[in-house]
């Protein structure tokens, strides 16, 4: 394990605000308790796995069984900030263009937009209440060079990717978002929105199950063997047998799961706090104007959005340990950062604090594909913090691949890079600790 055992303890709930918006006791999918055979086994019952199961069953009549290690929504699907947005590659625009060229970079951005649209489409088609908010995403620049980057992003997104975008001056920010004397400006991108991720995930599960997919939570894969053309996935309660496997475990992928997948991913802790509901007078005191999700163009990322009941959700990078003491330090640090950023809310109570794992890859790109050594094994993960939309799109794409409706070569090149091992993988988190320590020392977040 790269982090403290508490990060992986599936008997502990996240303690998130989202958990208070649903009745978790009503989620009654059983664990696997006997041997089963199915067409497709899906390891991971988050957004990617559920989207794959739904599309396999509904669109292609293919039976699948999902093995989820914890309770439904225990992982990132129930812990994220509910940003249905683009940005699944950690490579910036210039690096994407240099590596993949304009045509493939455009295809990547088109796929990202399709992902956000697919979430809304599924919510409408399957009657999923997702508590959608906002009509885009706002990126704020705090330095002159970052503002110039946003201007270049605007030129590319509008002229090449065909995104609806606007550049906002500090005056525009004051009138449409909130007064921010330090900001150089912002980029508004009109393809994103906010939602309640736990409601969305449970809605996907209900829809997938109603269309014929079987869902088995509390059923971690203890061993994975191959017998001829059959994959044998052993859990504590029984064995699942399938000729095709989809791995959709993202930041919670265990290195031991499959030798061709181990040491290829880097889970990163991300932390979130929420305030009590803010009154209309408190919102007015801060000059707050929007429900559209916001993130900042900092070395240290801050992201935030106003929720349906008036709470402010405020997120940032997590720690590098994940133990109780560090979590409390992160909560205090984030509460202080929130108060410094929004002085009118400096003394507002923090009601919820939690963290979860974001997934990065060695290539800094998302990955959707199949193993060259065993083409009956498919995978989708490494969304770099944009898993709501990209996980949904990846799940549909994986279903299309399994059903033979598309080929790997048809995917945007950004998604089909070969999986690469991290050098000295046991030191992955130590690299991260050194990077964060240097960043804090040099105060690069300013």
Predicted regions and their residues:
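Helix-rich C-terminal "cap"/substrate-channel and partner-interaction subdomain
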Residues: 363-366, 370-373, 378, 408-446
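Extreme N-terminal leader/targeting segments of oxidoreductases
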Residues: 1-40, 58-59
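Internal hydrophobic alpha-helix adjacent to the cofactor/substrate pocket in enzyme cavities
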Residues: 391-411
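N-terminal Rossmann-like FAD-binding beta1-loop-alpha1 element of flavoenzymes
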Residues: 38-66
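Helical element adjacent to the flavin cofactor pocket in flavoenzyme catalytic cores
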Residues: 156-158, 183-243
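Active-site substrate-recognition segment that forms the wall
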Residues: 82, 117, 125-133, 221-223, ...
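Glycine-rich active-site loop/strand segments that organize a redox cofactor
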Residues: 80-110
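Flavin (FAD/FMN) cofactor-binding and adjacent substrate-gating region
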Residues: 2-15, 21, 90-97, 120-203
